[in-house]
Amino acid sequence: MPRLFGTDGVRGLANGETITADLALRLAQAAAHVLGQDARDPRVSGEFIAAAVAAGLASSGVDVFDAGVIPTPATAYLIADFDADFGVMISASHNPAPDNGIKFFAAGGRKLADELEDRIEAQLSRPVLLPTGADVGRIRRFADAEDRYVLHLLGTLQHRLDGIHVVLDCAHGAAAGISPEVFTDAGARVTVIGNDPDGMNINDRVGSTHLDLLAEAVLAHGADVGIAHDGDADRCLAVDHTGAIIDGDQIMAVLALSMARRGLLAERTLVATVMSNLGLRIAMAENDITVMQTRVGDRYVLEAMNEGGYSLGGEQSGHLVIAEHATTGDGILTGIQLLGEMAATGKSLHELASVMTVYPQVMINVRGVDRDRVGDDAELNAAVARAEAELGDTGRILMRASGTEPMIRVMVEAADQATAERHAEELAALVTERLAI
């Protein structure tokens, strides 16, 4: 039977096979047993799932403080600030509105270790002894949750954002009520799009996975910069004043150099995943900064940061963790820190991001193959070695097995698009030929 927990909690189609009211209630009861706050994004299904989670927790003797619609990183922050035992976020992040998910945070606002998730999952199949009468938990509204989080974010800024015109794309998500307030209070001139959540339009052609609208708005309004969040606001991607997309790797490069300059980049090390662009490693090496690479997934970035005591890490997708101020990826925090660097240096985002050259990257998903044999086929390994020799220091190849389906991802970076495409297509064809099921 496949593991219930994925890389970011339990996720699936709301009221489908996985994310049901019954599962939410039982999962909450199991979590109460193992771990012993409740928040969500604006998806319409979040209402019944949050109610079921709250009921499951309270019926297990846990006092629940319902923070309502807030970003995932706000939940993590409030767990620590409120000294809660644990917390729950109802969200499917950047997924479309029909999906939803349940993710748990431990005390201090940190993501659960695999071992704790496994214990919760195992508890689902065991009988649960529930309290009765006066021993059940209470469900209360966390009235000042949003205000606490806003004050925390504003307190992280070293420079006000006066004079910077920013377009915010809130993805019709959890950032809608908070991000514009934070940027405005910090002094920026704010234009907002994707800020009318109705429960069904979250991430719908807006947000960090659909940047065309943001780029158009930045150009139309003559803004200095655009910032895009995803549905639960744990991501941040940007657009410069020319309409060019600035991805998570480029944002990490800007913030790493800023933190290194101020003596805040622990061990002069940045934590990134194997999917981060070769240009990031080259730019950091030129500035005497080490890039530590992890598996894909912000949880693995967090684990490496916690183990090594590092202060900055993230993913190309826009999950960035700034350890001084957050225990998880925080899109609003990342955005204001990025604009803070613009304010501190007087440089445009275009200038700041130019520290890194983005190498063309081509990804091909090869389906219907034996993912367990990646790396074991001699002919395929020889082809990869030949391609790597041709690319030299100006490219790289990564083959990655999917964790959920019979698929292998072939990724090639090169100095030019045509070379990257040629090698990716040749290797993908060979993967199909050699590893077909």
UniProtKB/Swiss-Prot annotation:
It catalyses: alpha-D-glucosamine 1-phosphate = D-glucosamine 6-phosphate. Mg(2+) binds at S93, D230, D232, D234. Its cofactor is Mg(2+). The active site is at S93 (phosphoserine intermediate). The keyword Cell inner membrane does not apply. Catalyzes the conversion of glucosamine-6-phosphate to glucosamine-1-phosphate. This is Phosphoglucosamine mutase. Binds 1 Mg(2+) ion per subunit.
